[in-house]
């Protein structure tokens, strides 16, 4: 199913963040953060609103530059070559005001020109084959998110970042996206996924990072995270209480 995906993510692990801060205009968002992501599979990032989750993912993807500190992939500092092996899906994806298929072929032309058949195959995988000629900007929220994921898969990433890609989507779209991500992970793609949905994290995560006020308070396997939270803040978050 994922024969066109790059399966070399293991060479980019571990991902290490060393003493990273992000302090634009003296607004401290990430503070002296140290983190190592060793595992393959799906890593979920959780935390309250404004905790720095999206900023952390953008730092990992190279969309933002740390004020200080270092980010490495497999002992190599984050660079353009590594970024070419990454893709990102945002909560509100930006799509071309063209057809669904044109959105795919445009992305395909940027990278390896894998061909029209692959574009159509990936659209079918995401349940979008009947929308090939449909204007992308007129799709439903769930369909737009599936198209964004299809474009990301077309890039053949070793590491795929997703920033709340299923927020406010219908259950069928959520189920399909989760299924695709599990299959991609099984094919060797490292998934780093932001969500507020505790049940979703239980379904898909291999390990969970909990961040609050720009600091990682916990990074454990999913079963430990939910059964034996290591910090008061984590336990309060899981109980639906926000500790300010």
Identify the role of each PLM range:
Residues 61:
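Helix-to-loop junction immediately C-terminal to a conserved catalytic motif
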Residues 195-196:
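H-loop/switch region of ABC-family ATPase nucleotide-binding domains
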Residues 160-163:
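Catalytic Walker B motif of ABC-type/P-loop ATPase nucleotide-binding domains
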Residues 135-139, 143:
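Conserved ABC ATPase signature
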Residues 171-173:
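Helix N-cap at the start of a conserved alpha-helix in ABC-type nucleotide-binding domains
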Residues 201-203:
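A short, surface-exposed alpha-helical micro-motif characterized by mixed small hydrophobic
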Residues 116-131:
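Conserved ABC ATPase "signature" region
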